[in-house]
UniProtKB/Swiss-Prot annotation:
<dbReference type="Pfam" id="PF12344">
    <property type="entry name" value="UvrB"/>
</dbReference>
<keyword id="KW-0067">ATP-binding</keyword>
<dbReference type="GO" id="GO:0009380">
    <property type="term" value="C:excinuclease repair complex"/>
</dbReference>
<dbReference type="InterPro" id="IPR001650">
    <property type="entry name" value="Helicase_C-like"/>
</dbReference>
<dbReference type="Pfam" id="PF17757">
    <property type="entry name" value="UvrB_inter"/>
</dbReference>
<comment type="subunit">
    <text>Forms a heterotetramer with UvrA during the search for lesions. Interacts with UvrC in an incision complex.</text>
</comment>
<dbReference type="InterPro" id="IPR004807">
    <property type="entry name" value="UvrB"/>
</dbReference>
<keyword id="KW-0547">Nucleotide-binding</keyword>
<dbReference type="InterPro" id="IPR014001">
    <property type="entry name" value="Helicase_ATP-bd"/>
</dbReference>
<comment type="function">
    <text>The UvrABC repair system catalyzes the recognition and processing of DNA lesions. A damage recognition complex composed of 2 UvrA and 2 UvrB subunits scans DNA for abnormalities. Upon binding of the UvrA(2)B(2) complex to a putative damaged site, the DNA wraps around one UvrB monomer. DNA wrap is dependent on ATP binding by UvrB and probably causes local melting of the DNA helix, facilitating insertion of UvrB beta-hairpin between the DNA strands. Then UvrB probes one DNA strand for the presence of a lesion.</text>
</comment>
<keyword id="KW-0228">DNA excision</keyword>
<feature type="domain" description="UVR">
    <location>
        <begin position="621"/>
        <end position="656"/>
    </location>
</feature>
<dbReference type="InterPro" id="IPR006935">
    <property type="entry name" value="Helicase/UvrB_N"/>
</dbReference>
<dbReference type="Pfam" id="PF02151">
    <property type="entry name" value="UVR"/>
</dbReference>
<dbReference type="InterPro" id="IPR041471">
    <property type="entry name" value="UvrB_inter"/>
</dbReference>
<dbReference type="GO" id="GO:0016887">
    <property type="term" value="F:ATP hydrolysis activity"/>
</dbReference>
<keyword id="KW-0963">Cytoplasm</keyword>
Length: 661
C-alpha cells in the first residue's frame, strides 16, 4: 500500500506545526468537525497536505468553485507527485437544464456541452478511489450531485490478465456494455478497435495512453500500454481493469428491472393526471416516457436517462441519490475550503433544483421520480460527510456551531508578515484623500487596490483617475477570464498602478506588490461591507510588509469594529511572535507567471488569435476539434513528428481551457 509522501523543500513553520498537531489530535479523538481558521498567506493548503500525510487517509477537498478547486489541485499535485491527486468538478462547459415556463407555455430542452478533459479526470478520480488508498480528490460542491452507483460501477468492470482465456465475442460485448464504442478508424478515448489477434482499448481515464491486448486463440498473451498516436509501446502490464465509459453503466438485468419500475410509475401517474382532468399533460407524459422506454429497451440508455436514476439504483422515493461520497472509504477525511462560502452553497443547491423539476412534473414533462435525480439535501450531506475539517479565515455560523466555537488558528505566517495596518478616515472627501494616498503608495513602488460599492462608481472613479494620468484599470464581472489574468499580471508588473473593483477583490487575489487597499464607503452596511467581506478584503494587503488598509467611513459600524478589532488582534499576536523569534517580515517575492498556460501555446498561435480563442469558448472548442483532426490526419499519413507536435499543442490548449473555464 502506498503512503502519502510530501515532496517539498519547505517544512511546517509559524503556526503550522501547532495547528497540524491539534487537528490530528482531534481526528484521533474522533471529533467529527473541526475548524481551521487560516488567515491569508498562512499556508492553509500546505497545512492540509501535512495533515493528510500524517494521518495517511483518503481525502476529499471541497472548494466553492472550479477555479479555486483547480488551484488547490495544482498545489496538491506538486506536493504529492507519487500519490493519486484527482480533480472532480462538473464536466459541463455549458449547461442549460430542461425547464418549463408555465406563464408563457415555453419548454426549454436540455442543452449542454461536455468537457472531455474534465470527464476523463472524473473517471480517473472514481477509479482511484476504488483501486487505491493514497488518493486526494479535489472537488467543487458539484460532488453532491447524483452519480452512478459505486456498486454497479465496480460490478461492471472487466478484469484482464495475461495467461487467462477470454471468449473474443463475449469480451467485445462486455466492452459495449461498458458503453465503449467500436471504432476501427477514429481511435479515441472511450473506444476500442480490433486488428487481427489484437484488441486495442482506449480507457476512459486516459488521454494519451491505450492498451493493446494480444491474443493467441482465446488466450490473452500480453497487455501492452502504448501511445495511441505513434503506436510506441510504453510498458508491459501484468493486469488491466476496464471501468465503464460512463458512471451510469449497469447490467442488463438492472435495466430490465428499471423499465418495469418506470412502466408501473407511468401508469399510476397517467391515472392521476386523468383524474385531475389534464388531457394535455397526460398525452405529453405518455408520449415522452414511451419514447424513453423504447430507447432503454433497444440501447440500454436514453436522452435524460439520469431522470430515471432512482430505478437503476434501486432507491426508494425520497431517498438520497448515490454521489461521490459513496465512493469514499469509511475512514476518509473531508476538508471544506473557504467554508464560509462553500457551506451556504451546499445548503442552497437542493431547493433550486427541486423548484425547477417540480414544474416539469406538474405539467407532464417528467415522472415524479425525476425529483430524485437531485443534489443532496444539506441534512443528507451533513449525515454522509466523514470526519471534517472546515477551513476559512472567516468561519460561518454552521461551522462554529458544529465545533462549539472552538477553532484551530493559523495566524503566524511562515514569512513573518503581519496583518496590515487598518486606518479609518472620513468618507466625506474620500476621493480627494484617496488620490493623495495613491501618490504616496506609487512613490514607494507599490500598487493600489480600490473597492467601491457600485459598478457606476467604479467606472467613474477609473475614468477620473485615468484623466489624472494614473495608470488605472477596472476589474468587473464582464471581464473575460484571460483578460482578468492579464490585468492582474499588468498590475504586478507595474503596467497598471491602480486597480478598481467591486466584489472581485476578496478571496484568492494574490498581489504581493499591493501596498494599499482602499475601501470606499466602508460604513454602508450590507453584503459588500459585512464583517466577513471586510476581513477578506483587508487580507489582500497582507502579502506586503508595508501593506496598509484605509477604510473610508463617517461612522463606526459593527462590521468595521469587528473586522478592524480582529485584524488588530492578529497583528499583535504576529508582532509578539516575530519579536520573540527575531523575525523580520519580508514581502513575498513570488514569480509573475499568471499567463504561463497561455504563453505555452505553440508559436503558430499568434497572440491576437489566442485572445480570440480564449475570449470565445465556442471558438476555442472549434479550434481544439480542428487540431484533433489535423493530428489524426498527420498520424494516418505516418507524419509522426508533426502529429506529436500537434498533440503537444492540443494538450496545452486543453489544459489551459480547463484552468480558464
Amino acid at each position: 500500500m502506498n503512503n502519502f509522501s510530501i515532496i517539498s523543500e519547505y517544512k511546517p513553520a509559524g503556526d503550522q506545526p501547532k495547528a497540524i498537531d491539534e487537528i490530528i489530535a482531534g481526528l484521533s479523538s474522533k471529533k467529527r468537525s473541526q475548524m481551521l481558521l487560516g488567515i491569508t498567506g498562512s499556508g492553509k493548503t500546505f497545512t492540509m497536505a501535512n495533515i493528510i500525510e500524517r494521518t495517511n487517509r483518503p481525502t476529499l477537498i471541497m472548494a466553492h468553485n472550479k477555479t479555486l478547486a483547480a488551484q488547490i489541485y495544482s498545489e496538491m499535485k506538486s506536493l504529492f507527485p507519487k500519490n493519486a491527486v484527482e480533480y472532480f468538478v462538473s464536466y459541463y462547459d455549458y449547461y442549460q437544464p430542461e425547464a418549463y415556463i408555465a406563464r408563457t407555455d415555453t419548454f426549454i430542452e436540455k442543452d449542454s456541452s461536455i468537457n472531455e478533459q474534465i470527464d476523463l479526470m472524473r473517471h480517473a478520480a472514481t477509479r482511484s478511489l476504488l483501486e487505491r488508498r493514497d488518493v486526494i480528490v479535489v472537488s467543487s460542491v458539484s460532488c453532491i450531485y447524483g452519480l452512478g452507483s459505486p456498486d454497479l460501477y465496480y460490478q461492471m468492470v472487466v478484469n484482464l490478465e495475461p495467461g487467462q482465456s477470454y471468449l473474443r465475442d463475449q469480451l467485445l460485448n462486455d466492452l459495449i456494455n461498458l458503453q465503449y464504442e467500436r471504432n476501427d478508424i477514429g481511435f479515441e478515448r472511450g473506444c476500442f478497435r480490433v486488428k487481427g489477434d489484437n484488441i486495442d482499448i482506449f480507457p476512459s481515464h486516459y488521454s494519451d495512453k491505450a492498451w493493446r491486448l494480444s491474443f493467441f486463440g482465446n488466450e490473452l498473451e500480453y497487455i501492452h500500454e502504448f501511445d495511441p498516436l505513434t503506436g510506441e509501446k510504453l510498458a508491459k502490464l501484468d493486469k488491466a481493469i476496464v471501468f465503464g465509459n460512463s458512471h451510469f453503466v449497469m447490467p442488463q438485468e438492472t435495466v430490465n428491472n428499471a423499465i418495469s419500475g418506470i412502466e408501473e410509475e407511468l401508469q399510476k401517474r397517467l391515472e392521476f393526471l386523468k383524474s385531475q382532468d389534464k388531457p394535455l399533460e397526460t398525452q405529453r407524459l405518455n408520449q415522452r416516457t414511451q419514447y424513453d422506454l423504447e430507447m432503454l429497451t433497444e440501447t440500454g440508455s436514453c436522452k435524460g436517462v439520469e431522470n430515471y436514476s432512482r430505478f437503476f439504483t434501486g432507491r426508494n422515493a425520497g431517498e438520497p441519490p448515490p454521489t461521490l461520497f459513496e465512493y469514499l472509504p469509511e475512514d476518509a477525511l473531508l476538508f471544506v475550503d473557504e467554508s464560509h462560502v462553500s457551506v451556504p452553497q451546499i445548503r442552497a443547491m437542493y431547493n433550486g433544483d427541486r423548484a425547477r423539476k417540480k414544474v416539469l412534473v406538474e405539467h407532464g414533462f417528467r415522472l415524479p421520480s425525476a425529483l430524485d435525480n437531485r443534489p443532496l439535501k444539506f441534512e443528507e450531506w451533513d449525515k454522509f460527510r466523514p470526519q471534517t475539517v472546515f477551513v476559512s479565515a472567516t468561519p460561518g455560523p454552521f461551522e462554529l456551531e458544529e465545533t462549539g466555537g472552538t477553532v484551530v488558528e493559523l495566524i503566524i505566517r511562515p514569512t513573518g508578515l503581519l496583518d496590515p495596518e487598518c486606518i479609518i478616515k472620513p468618507a466625506t472627501n474620500q476621493v480627494e484623500d484617496l488620490i493623495s494616498e495613491i501618490q504616496t503608495t506609487i512613490a514607494q513602488g507599490f500598487r493600489v487596490l480600490v473597492t467601491t460599492l457600485t459598478k457606476k462608481m467604479a467606472e467613474d472613479l477609473t475614468a477620473y483617475l485615468q484623466e489624472l494620468k494614473y495608470k488605472t484599470s477596472y476589474l468587473h464581472s464582464n471581464v473575460h477570464t484571460l483578460e482578468r489574468i492579464e490585468i492582474l499580471r499588468d498590475l504586478r508588473q507595474g503596467t497598471i498602478d491602480v486597480l478598481v473593483g467591486i466584489n472581485l477583490l476578496r478571496e484568492g487575489l494574490d498581489i504581493p506588490e499591493c501596498g494599499l487597499v482602499a475601501i470606499l464607503d466602508a460604513d454602508k452596511e450590507g453584503f459588500l461591507r459585512s464583517e466577513v467581506s471586510l476581513i477578506q478584503t483587508i487580507g489582500r494587503a497582507a502579502r506586503n510588509s508595508a501593506g496598509r488598509v484605509i477604510l473610508y467611513a463617517d461612522k463606526m459600524t459593527k462590521s468595521i469594529d469587528k473586522a478592524v478589532s480582529e485584524t488588530l488582534r492578529r497583528r499583535q499576536i504576529q508582532q509578539e511572535y516575530n519579536e520573540k523569534h527575531g523575525i523580520i517580515p519580508k514581502t513575498i517575492n513570488r514569480a509573475i507567471h499568471a499567463l504561463a498556460e497561455f504563453e505555452k501555446i505553440d508559436s503558430k498561435l499568434d497572440k491576437k488569435q489566442a485572445h480570440t480563442l480564449f475570449d470565445n469558448p465556442a471558438k476555442l472548442k472549434t479550434h481544439i476539434d480542428k487540431l484533433k483532426k489535423e493530428m489524426l490526419k498527420a498520424a494516418s499519413n505516418l507524419e509522426f513528428e508533426q502529429a506529436v507536435k500537434l498533440r503537444d499543442q492540443l494538450k496545452t490548449l486543453e489544459e489551459a481551457a480547463l484552468e480558464l473555464s
